[in-house]
């Protein structure tokens, strides 16, 4: 098969193993940190098959590229302009959008064009830049997802400690640290990336590792640092968050039932107050709470003076109170956590095949090449780019405030012209004033004239 033939021609002499950046069959992170640019000579396959494959590939690349650029630019604009969305969590989502936009703009065109031209024409500088920027983008996205998970865990499960440091300035420092750490981690990519000839007038952007052992060590290191360890941290954090939210909703449900029963029988605390849990350092103990005082799923203890006033106050009969504001805030937090979980799952689903293929190729290159050449590796390649365009779709479908902010931003950028009031036709009678307008007119006339 042509992929295996080309892979053999790329290896070259010497102790180092070469990983091509110009091939759909080459690992994304071991090659360009993601980009294999197909440099197949047109004579390798039949003309009809190659043209059909290229048409499908161009269409998919174009759709993913437009969705990635348009969606992430929209996220950056909306989060930047909307004051209501300037929260700590959204600051990390903004950084995530920037990294996805970097992945789309800096890597996708330089992956597709060599596919069409059959050779890499952009030179060594662009070759090294593609490799480095894609690695940085993937690393930043992973670290941002870890930071979001830890921030949500602190806000929901450790609210008292989180209030000390959970600020936008602290989030900005964490985001800066993720970008710097990712930049340092991906330094080996530009060092071992180069453009080499693999045939007559055919160039490839590829990696030349010093030895096979170095390539294997690098693959395992990335698998641990950017996949397994972040995956475990995120899973544990969201597991604890889900447990805390479930306990908060469960306690609120019990308190609401007790409050309604007390209001029907002998009356109870006004405003839906009921014995509830207060979370301290992850634990819960029953105290009296007031609805809506805390938005992190943790009830706040009622001061003694208010308890005394509550005891002396006789409740007035009225309708059974509805859902408490505190429960509504817990439900809102649950929706946000659900959205973040979807983002994390989609990211790891898109990149799991890439990491698996990279590790497989590092330890068994010929076997991986035989099994994945052709359509499978092309699908894996495109799947990694899909991760850059799914987040805007998730926000639009699962984030009500983001949808409203998008509408507000569009209305601000494209204001509608004022509507002119329809004029009555010549043969139409003038509109008859309503009873309410007549009453206002009479009242205005009497008030203006004053007493007679």
From Swiss-Prot:
Main location: membrane
GO cellular component terms attached to this protein's record: membrane; plasma membrane
UniProt note on tissues of expression: Parietal cells, pancreas, brain and various neoplastic tissues.
PROSITE patterns for the chain: G_PROTEIN_RECEP_F1_1, G_PROTEIN_RECEP_F1_2
Coiled-coil zones: none
Topology relative to the membrane: Multi-pass membrane protein
Subcellular location: Cell membrane
Gene Ontology MF terms: cholecystokinin receptor activity; gastrin receptor activity; neuropeptide receptor activity; peptide hormone binding; type B gastrin/cholecystokinin receptor binding
Protein name as it appears in the record: Gastrin/cholecystokinin type B receptor
Organism field: Rattus norvegicus (Rat)
């Amino acid at each position: 098969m042509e992929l295996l033939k080309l892979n053999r021609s790329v290896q070259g002499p010497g102790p180092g193993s070469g990983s091509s950046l110009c091939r759909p069959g080459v690992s994304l992170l071991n090659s360009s940190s993601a980009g294999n640019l197909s440099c197949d000579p047109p004579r390798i396959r039949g003309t009809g098959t190659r043209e059909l494959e290229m048409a499908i590939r161009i269409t998919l690349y174009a759709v993913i590229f437009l969705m990635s650029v348009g969606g992430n630019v929209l996220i950056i604009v909306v989060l930047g302009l909307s004051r209501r969305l300037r929260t700590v969590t959204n600051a990390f989502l903004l950084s995530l959008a920037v990294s996805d936009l970097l992945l789309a703009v800096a890597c996708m065109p330089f992956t597709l064009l060599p596919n069409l031209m059959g050779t890499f024409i952009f030179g060594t500088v662009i070759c090294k830049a593609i490799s480095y920027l894609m690695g940085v983008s993937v690393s930043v996205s992973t670290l941002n997802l870890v930071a979001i998970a830890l921030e949500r865990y602190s806000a929901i499960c450790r609210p008292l400690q989180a209030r000390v440091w959970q600020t936008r300035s602290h989030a900005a420092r964490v985001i800066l640290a993720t970008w710097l750490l990712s930049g340092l981690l991906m330094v080996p990519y530009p060092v071992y990336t180069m453009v080499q000839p693999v045939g007559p007038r055919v160039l490839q952007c590829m990696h030349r590792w010093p030895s096979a052992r170095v390539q294997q060590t690098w693959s395992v290191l990335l698998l641990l640092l950017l996949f397994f360890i972040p995956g475990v941290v995120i899973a544990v954090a969201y597991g604890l968050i889900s447990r805390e939210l479930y306990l908060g909703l469960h306690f609120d449900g019990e308190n609401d039932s007790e409050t309604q029963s007390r209001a029907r029988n002998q009356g109870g605390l006004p405003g839906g107050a009921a014995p509830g849990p207060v979370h301290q350092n992850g634990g819960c103990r029953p105290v009296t709470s007031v609805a809506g005082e805390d938005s992190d799923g943790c009830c706040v203890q009622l001061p003694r003076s208010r308890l005394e006033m509550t005891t002396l106050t006789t409740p007035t009969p009225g309708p059974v109170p509805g859902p408490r504001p505190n429960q509504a805030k817990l439900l809102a937090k649950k929706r946000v956590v659900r959205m973040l979980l979807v983002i994390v799952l989609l990211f790891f689903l898109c990149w799991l095949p890439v990491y698996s293929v990279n590790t497989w190729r590092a330890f068994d290159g010929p076997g991986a090449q035989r099994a994945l050449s052709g359509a499978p590796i092309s699908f894996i390649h495109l799947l990694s780019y899909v991760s850059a365009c799914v987040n805007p779709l998730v926000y639009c479908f699962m984030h009500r405030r983001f949808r409203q902010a998008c509408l507000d931003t569009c209305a601000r950028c494209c204001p509608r012209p004022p509507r002119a009031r329809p004029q009555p036709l010549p043969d139409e009678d003038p509109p008859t004033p309503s009873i309410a307008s007549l009453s206002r007119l009479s009242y205005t006339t009497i008030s203006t004239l004053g007493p007679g």
